[in-house]
Amino acid sequence: MLYDGRALVLTSEKEACNRYCLLEVSPLGVKEIAAWDCDHVWKEEPLLFTDGQNIGIIKAGREMVYYTGDFSHPEIIAIKDPQSILPKNAQERYFQIVSDSDQIPVCFEDQVYTNQARNFALLEFDRENKQAKWTTYSHIDKKDLSHHDMSSDACPKIDSMKSWKQELYAFTSGESQTSINKWGMDYYALVKIFSDGRVIEKIFESDCLKGAGKKAGVNGLFTDTDYLILTPLFKNDDWKGKQKLFSLATRELCDIALPRGMSKHKLQNMTDNCCLTYLYDRGLKELALCQID
């Protein structure tokens, strides 16, 4: 989301899943900024990020399309020597990218492709000189997570990452390699990490969910504020399926109250003054911008 309350949405067209659209959502309506075909959608999933004023789209780890001003004349910026950092088979996965610095965290899959990122890389972006390069490729070191699976080499999954005040945060939804919608998660945690994936601090983590007697789990999504959106996987949990917010600044949990008639919407992102919600039912059905009281 931008500082002025506009939201940017990267989506694929319903009739052609290999055609992507970049949309601007504002109180004036929805405006298409760009559209392009992607021949290898699964391997080259584009990623969208913003610094609150400008927009960047990372394509296949090799180049960036950078929009400034009125977004009508984007610049193409080649990412320097990506093969020196990124493994050959690493594939970008789109999870909300949030950064307030020149270090942009990006999630990846490698070897096993199930749309569940377990690796990340940091992209160093010099906005003034229009230069970009990958600086590290790693995964979350699970040995400091209380309920990690010692019998498996699987790395923790990464729901979302955020670079905030020169520190790196990640939300992991556990290590399970089976369907979490069918069996639930094994654990989840919010951690502060070093760039090599070592855990600095466990801000919070769940109990071991596999022995809880019922399916459970929570997904986490960082926003353009200090808040993390927490979304329960199941509606019969202690939160009754309702989203909550966790503040990185105050370390407090709070409830979300959406406007009347929008109970089926989910919160996707927010600034200090407004938020973006969506209704998803076998595809994106609705988007809404709401003011925050």
Task: Describe the residue ranges of each PLM region.
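Structural signature of eukaryotic scaffold interfaces centered on beta-propeller domains
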Residues: 1-3, 47-51, 93-101, 157-164, ...
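Structural motif
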Residues: 16-22, 61-68, 113-122, 177-190, ...
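Short loop/turn segments that connect beta-strands within beta-propeller blades
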Residues: 25-29, 68-72, 126-129, 194-196, ...
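Blade-level signature of beta-propeller repeat domains, shared across WD40, Kelch, NHL, RCC1
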Residues: 264-293
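Recurrent small/Gly-Pro-centered beta-turn motifs in extracellular repeat architectures
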Residues: 9-13, 58-60, 106-111, 171-174, ...
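Beta-rich catalytic cores
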Residues: 42-44, 90-93, 154-157, 186, ...
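Surface-exposed loop and turn segments in beta-propeller and other repeat-based domains
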Residues: 35-41, 77-90, 134-154, 200-214, ...
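Loop/turn-rich, solvent-exposed surfaces of beta-rich toroidal or solenoidal domains
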Residues: 172-174, 183-186, 206-243
